[in-house]
């Protein structure tokens, strides 16, 4: 079973994995975020649990950077999504990004938010196809990132929150 919980220090060891060079060039590893985990920041880090074991990670960010991705002041930016290589291909990431799991997360941690945005590097077609399969839509916006042009994708929960 897949669950999303706030990242905790006891998850660090399991989340201190490496990604293939191909994957690592497109995302920050979870360990990059660990030092600031308990600091008061405009973001929250989450662990993806599979059978109660931490196997993945992502950040939801309400900081200034999100304004580059959306004009919606209530949007949150999805960052640094990854799954431990030993658990890739099992559908864990897709389950983690399902409405069933993200909706309660937004309601609890970001109650005024109804949109999740992210950037996907144009060279990362696998991730682009994955996020579309999870229900994200291409906004037709693009952004120049550190490693090249990014397509901006959005997942809108406003209809779900009002129904």
Where are these regions (language model features)?
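Conserved active-site alpha-helix within GNAT-family acetyltransferase domains
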Residues: 94, 104, 122-140
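Terminal substrate-recognition subdomain of acyl/acetyltransferases
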Residues: 142-163
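Acetyl-CoA-dependent GNAT
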Residues: 2, 6-80, 84-86, 97-99, ...
């Amino acid at each position: 079973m897949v669950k999303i919980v706030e990242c905790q220090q006891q998850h660090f060891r399991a989340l201190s994995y490496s990604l293939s060079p191909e994957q690592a060039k497109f995302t920050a590893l979870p360990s990059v975020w660990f030092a600031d985990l308990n600091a008061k920041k405009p973001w929250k880090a989450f662990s993806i649990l599979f059978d109660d074991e931490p196997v993945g990670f992502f950040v939801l960010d309400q900081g200034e950077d999100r304004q580059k991705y959306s004009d919606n002041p209530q949007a949150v930016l999805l960052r640094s999504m990854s799954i431990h290589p030993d658990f890739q291909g099992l559908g864990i990431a897709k389950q983690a990004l399902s409405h069933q799991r993200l909706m309660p997360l937004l309601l609890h941690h970001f109650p005024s938010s109804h949109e999740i945005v992210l950037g996907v590097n144009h060279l990362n077609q696998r991730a682009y196809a994955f996020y579309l399969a999870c229900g994200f839509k291409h906004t037709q916006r693009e952004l120049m990132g550190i490693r090249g042009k990014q397509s901006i994708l959005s997942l809108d929960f406003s209809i779900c929150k009002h129904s």
